[in-house]
């Protein structure tokens, strides 16, 4: 019987290798394939990877298609054994003192005690930028708003200089200001970048790429270009120019703190970046002498705070992860060898962008919803028969515990866990929203299963739909809505109906996010899906309608579509004067970023043995050295 091959770790930048600091041996299961070596900075460890060797004929005598997904990588007993010393009150007390001291740094800047009118704008922007990249900005919301209000006060159609009395604008301050102000919802136009082009329409630079100031300027230009809106040609020009410039720079110079920052941002961009991963990386380079603006900031205290916050959050992650693992174990899913077990990976994604300790319900709900969606994906795509799928879909629409009577045994357990978990999350949402939200959730799950039924019919009949038909259905079957809806309703952010309908399906926001994920996911999954008998994908449907195009042509076209959709989603999130605040949309937006992260190199949710496993190690299991 053929096994699903596990690809070796992709050849990537120095950055990715330096992020992997160590790993834990995983408890091997009885059936294993040759072990997968993973490189780390200090050593090489070996993890046993177990594959699901499901027989074509199941125990009930029914012939079924199989997925051959590798099994759970994270032993339940190993998860329960996790511990950390950072639960001690002394660490929280120290963090509280450091927060007060950092606030005093902001006060000194506001009072002009440590800066001058010649650098007061760039100083504020740099302070805000570093605090956000270190992952501690939640403690300084008022200070950040005050700093950005000040910068915006001096913003002009030509941008800004280093200070309010600089006399001339400069590209570094303007690019950093454009990015930071835009991300916080200020109405700033990218047209400010036009004045920094020469007579040939090119951004002006020196001929030798050795000046750290110029390199940092182009770096900030690249970062600004990542938050482009539709039809902003100057942002496209900025990204093309800065990408070429920075790649040439990285090829010429030795490893440094600045080059490591550039590598990280060029590797992860903004739409596949995760705040906790970025914070872990930035801690290793923060405070180096390549950051001259730091002269008025106590970088040691700021860095200590970031490290303490990172490690204190570990205790929260471990507590929540143990809960998730118990839920997975008690659900009986651990006995189902025909489905993917990615509960740990999904929780990790949530904890890498929802990093406020108070958002525990969001993280837990996200992990559970994602895992349930994945279990149903594997049932509808491969394991279930058409008759079973019709019965299960009808049972979910009844939404009654007695609806399991007509289901096969394996489906009874899945239905019960789905019913209980969705109702449980609805009760959590009722406390935070002050109203019953179960109907929102039920409608989302019904639409999800209806979209799967359509795909199952395509598989059973050998039908290859039109691209538009597949794409519209695929935006629902990806599962973005079911993974987003109940988690955001569990938060302490109010979502009245008029705001929720601007975020939930079929809103423009939801359609764009789901479209990005369906297109990107298909570029990573279509070959493996086709091998399992799932012929319909964005690639195959588009090729059918455009027979003159090669597979490579179509994949490149799909990537271009994703780039365009990302710009549109940027606008939906950040457009000024919107009746839906950014804070209400941010977690729904970050869910899209998190899923996108998993598709950066491959289908990280089917083959979770490489980058996604590294992410668990770096952000959940290993504390940062103090």
Swiss-Prot record:
<keyword id="KW-0479">Metal-binding</keyword>
<dbReference type="InterPro" id="IPR050148">
    <property type="entry name" value="Terpene_synthase-like"/>
</dbReference>
<dbReference type="GO" id="GO:1903448">
    <property type="term" value="P:geraniol biosynthetic process"/>
</dbReference>
<dbReference type="InterPro" id="IPR008930">
    <property type="entry name" value="Terpenoid_cyclase/PrenylTrfase"/>
</dbReference>
<dbReference type="GO" id="GO:0016787">
    <property type="term" value="F:hydrolase activity"/>
</dbReference>
<dbReference type="GO" id="GO:0016114">
    <property type="term" value="P:terpenoid biosynthetic process"/>
</dbReference>
<keyword id="KW-0934">Plastid</keyword>
<feature type="binding site">
    <location>
        <position position="377"/>
    </location>
    <ligand>
        <name>Mg(2+) 1</name>
    </ligand>
</feature>
<feature type="binding site">
    <location>
        <position position="529"/>
    </location>
    <ligand>
        <name>Mg(2+) 3</name>
    </ligand>
</feature>
<comment type="pathway">
    <text>Secondary metabolite biosynthesis; terpenoid biosynthesis.</text>
</comment>
<feature type="binding site">
    <location>
        <position position="381"/>
    </location>
    <ligand>
        <name>Mg(2+) 2</name>
    </ligand>
</feature>
<dbReference type="GO" id="GO:0000287">
    <property type="term" value="F:magnesium ion binding"/>
</dbReference>
<feature type="binding site">
    <location>
        <position position="377"/>
    </location>
    <ligand>
        <name>Mg(2+) 2</name>
    </ligand>
</feature>
<keyword id="KW-0150">Chloroplast</keyword>
<dbReference type="Pfam" id="PF03936">
    <property type="entry name" value="Terpene_synth_C"/>
</dbReference>
<dbReference type="InterPro" id="IPR005630">
    <property type="entry name" value="Terpene_synthase_metal-bd"/>
</dbReference>
<comment type="similarity">
    <text>Belongs to the terpene synthase family. Tpsd subfamily.</text>
</comment>
<dbReference type="Pfam" id="PF01397">
    <property type="entry name" value="Terpene_synth"/>
</dbReference>
<dbReference type="InterPro" id="IPR001906">
    <property type="entry name" value="Terpene_synth_N"/>
</dbReference>
<keyword id="KW-0378">Hydrolase</keyword>
<dbReference type="InterPro" id="IPR044814">
    <property type="entry name" value="Terpene_cyclase_plant_C1"/>
</dbReference>
<dbReference type="GO" id="GO:0010597">
    <property type="term" value="P:green leaf volatile biosynthetic process"/>
</dbReference>
<keyword id="KW-0460">Magnesium</keyword>
<feature type="binding site">
    <location>
        <position position="381"/>
    </location>
    <ligand>
        <name>Mg(2+) 1</name>
    </ligand>
</feature>
<feature type="transit peptide" description="Chloroplast">
    <location>
        <begin position="1"/>
        <end position="38"/>
    </location>
</feature>
<comment type="function">
    <text>Monoterpene synthase (TPS) involved in the biosynthesis of monoterpene natural products included in conifer oleoresin secretions and volatile emissions; these compounds contribute to biotic and abiotic stress defense against herbivores and pathogens. Catalyzes the conversion of (2E)-geranyl diphosphate (GPP) to (-)-alpha-terpineol, (+)-alpha-terpineol and terpin-4-ol, and, to a lower extent, to geraniol, terpinolene and (-)-limonene.</text>
</comment>
<dbReference type="GO" id="GO:0050552">
    <property type="term" value="F:(4S)-limonene synthase activity"/>
</dbReference>
<dbReference type="GO" id="GO:0010333">
    <property type="term" value="F:terpene synthase activity"/>
</dbReference>
<dbReference type="GO" id="GO:0009507">
    <property type="term" value="C:chloroplast"/>
</dbReference>
<dbReference type="InterPro" id="IPR036965">
    <property type="entry name" value="Terpene_synth_N_sf"/>
</dbReference>
<protein>
    <recommendedName>
        <fullName>Alpha terpineol synthase, chloroplastic</fullName>
        <ecNumber>4.2.3.111</ecNumber>
        <ecNumber>4.2.3.112</ecNumber>
        <ecNumber>4.2.3.16</ecNumber>
        <ecNumber>3.1.7.11</ecNumber>
        <ecNumber>4.2.3.113</ecNumber>
    </recommendedName>
</protein>
<dbReference type="InterPro" id="IPR034741">
    <property type="entry name" value="Terpene_cyclase-like_1_C"/>
</dbReference>
<dbReference type="InterPro" id="IPR008949">
    <property type="entry name" value="Isoprenoid_synthase_dom_sf"/>
</dbReference>
<feature type="short sequence motif" description="DDXXD motif">
    <location>
        <begin position="377"/>
        <end position="381"/>
    </location>
</feature>
<keyword id="KW-0456">Lyase</keyword>
<dbReference type="GO" id="GO:0016102">
    <property type="term" value="P:diterpenoid biosynthetic process"/>
</dbReference>
<comment type="pathway">
    <text>Terpene metabolism; oleoresin biosynthesis.</text>
</comment>
<keyword id="KW-0809">Transit peptide</keyword>
């Amino acid at each position: 019987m053929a096994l699903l091959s596990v690809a070796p770790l992709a050849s990537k930048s120095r950055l990715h290798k330096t992020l992997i600091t160590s790993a834990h041996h995983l408890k091997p299961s009885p059936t294993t394939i040759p072990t997968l070596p993973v490189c780390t900075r200090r050593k090489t460890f070996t993890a046993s990877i177990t594959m699901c060797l499901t027989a074509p004929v199941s125990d009930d005598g029914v012939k079924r298609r199989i997925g051959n997904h590798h099994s759970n990588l994270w032993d339940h007993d190993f998860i329960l054994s996790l511990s950390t010393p950072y639960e001690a009150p002394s660490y929280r007390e120290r963090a509280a003192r450091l927060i007060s001291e950092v606030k005093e740094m902001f006060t000194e800047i506001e009072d002009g005690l440590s800066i001058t009118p010649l650098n007061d704008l760039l100083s504020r922007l740099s302070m805000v930028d570093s605090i956000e990249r270190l992952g501690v900005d939640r403690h300084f919301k008022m200070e950040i708003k005050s700093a950005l209000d000040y910068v915006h006060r001096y913003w002009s159609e030509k941008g800004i200089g280093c200070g309010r009395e600089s006399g001339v604008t400069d590209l570094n301050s303007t690019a950093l200001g454009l990015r930071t102000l835009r991300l916080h919802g200020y109405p700033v136009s990218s047209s400010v970048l036009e004045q920094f082009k020469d007579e040939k329409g090119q951004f002006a630079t020196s001929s030798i790429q050795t000046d750290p100031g110029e390199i940092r300027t182009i770096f900030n230009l690249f970062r600004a270009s990542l938050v482009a809106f539709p039809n902003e040609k100057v942002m496209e020009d900025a990204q093309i120019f800065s990408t070429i410039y920075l790649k040439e720079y990285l090829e010429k110079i030795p490893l440094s703190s600045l080059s490591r920052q550039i590598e990280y941002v060029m590797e992860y961009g903004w739409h596949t970046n995760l705040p906790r991963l970025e914070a872990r990386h930035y801690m290793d380079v923060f405070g180096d002498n390549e950051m001259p603006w730091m002269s008025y900031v106590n970088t040691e205290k700021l860095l200590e705070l970031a490290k303490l916050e990172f490690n204190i959050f570990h205790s929260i992650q471990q507590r929540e992860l143990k809960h998730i693992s118990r839920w997975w174990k008690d659900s009986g899913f651990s006995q189902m060898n025909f489905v993917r077990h990615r509960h740990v990976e999904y929780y990790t994604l949530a904890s890498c962008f929802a990093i406020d300790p108070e958002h525990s319900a969001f993280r837990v709900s996200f992990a559970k919803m994602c895992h349930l969606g994945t279990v149903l994906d594997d049932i509808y795509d491969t394991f279930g028969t058409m008759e079973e799928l019709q019965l299960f879909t009808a049972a979910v629409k009844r939404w009654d515990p007695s609806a399991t009577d007509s289901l096969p045994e394996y489906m009874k357990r899945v239905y019960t866990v789905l019913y209980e978990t969705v109702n449980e999350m609805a009760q959590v949402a009722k406390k935070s929203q002050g109203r019953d939200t179960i109907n929102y959730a039920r409608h989302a799950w019904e639409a999800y299963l209806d979209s799967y039924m359509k795909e199952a019919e395509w598989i059973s009949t050998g039908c290859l739909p039109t691209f538009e038909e597949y794409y519209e259905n695929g935006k629902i079957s990806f599962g973005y809505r079911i993974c987003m809806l109940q988690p955001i309703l569990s938060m302490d952010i109010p979502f009245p109906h008029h705001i929720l309908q601007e975020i939930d399906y079929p809103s423009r926001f939801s359609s764009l996010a789901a479209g990005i994920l369906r297109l990107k996911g298909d570029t990573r999954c279509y070959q493996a899906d086709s091998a399992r008998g799932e012929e319909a994908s964005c690639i195959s449907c588009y090729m059918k309608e455009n027979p003159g195009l090669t597979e490579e042509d179509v994949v490149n076209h799909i990537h271009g579509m994703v780039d365009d959709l990302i710009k549109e989603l940027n606008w939906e999130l950040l457009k000024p004067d919107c009746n839906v605040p950014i804070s209400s949309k941010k977690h729904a937006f970050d869910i899209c970023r998190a899923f996108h992260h998993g598709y950066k190199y491959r289908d990280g949710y089917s083959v979770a043995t490489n980058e996604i496993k590294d992410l668990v190690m770096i952000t959940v299991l290993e504390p940062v050295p103090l």
